[in-house]
A protein has these predicted regions:
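A short beta-strand-turn-helix
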Residues: 2-19, 59
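CheY-like receiver
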Residues: 11-12, 61-64, 97
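Conserved helix-turn-beta segment immediately C-terminal to the redox Cys motif
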Residues: 16-18, 35-53
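Short pre-active-site segment immediately N-terminal to redox-active cysteine/selenocysteine motifs
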Residues: 17, 24-27, 69
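Conserved redox-active cysteine motifs that mediate thiol-disulfide chemistry
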Residues: 23-36
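Adenine-nucleotide cofactor-binding loop residues
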Residues: 56
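Structural micro-motif
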Residues: 59, 65-74
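Non-catalytic, surface beta->alpha helical segment in thiol-disulfide oxidoreductase systems
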Residues: 77-104
Length: 104
């Protein structure tokens, strides 16, 4: 999963019709639980771009998107925020959100 920062974020999201951004921190236990789930789903859904943003390294992005708790996932469609989730989601719940992102 590619890590984004303030300089790369907007271009990456604009270039990705469907994208999921994981706002995380290296010290966050729940973030560490979510990472392998996202890595697995990334391999199963080549039509969705997956990115990560370290909130400690990119605090302006965290503020811009109102990140108050981590992990937070933001799903984007055509460059626009579609839905935001907070906390660890199970794989079936993530797949359901991706289906919603693709079809709604």
């Amino acid at each position: 999963m590619k890590e984004l920062n303030e300089q790369t974020f907007d271009q990456a999201i604009a270039a990705s019709p469907l994208a999921v951004v994981d706002f995380f921190a290296t010290w966050c236990g729940p973030c560490k639980m979510l990472a392998p789930i996202l890595d697995g789903i990334e391999g199963e859904t080549p039509d969705v771009a997956f990115y990560r943003v370290d909130v400690d390294q990119a605090p302006d992005l965290a503020r811009r998107f109102g990140i108050m708790s981590i992990p937070t996932l933001i799903f984007f469609r055509d460059g626009n925020e579609f839905v935001k989730t907070v906390g660890v989601l199970r794989k079936p719940d993530l797949l359901a959100k991706l289906t919603e992102l693709k079809t709604r």
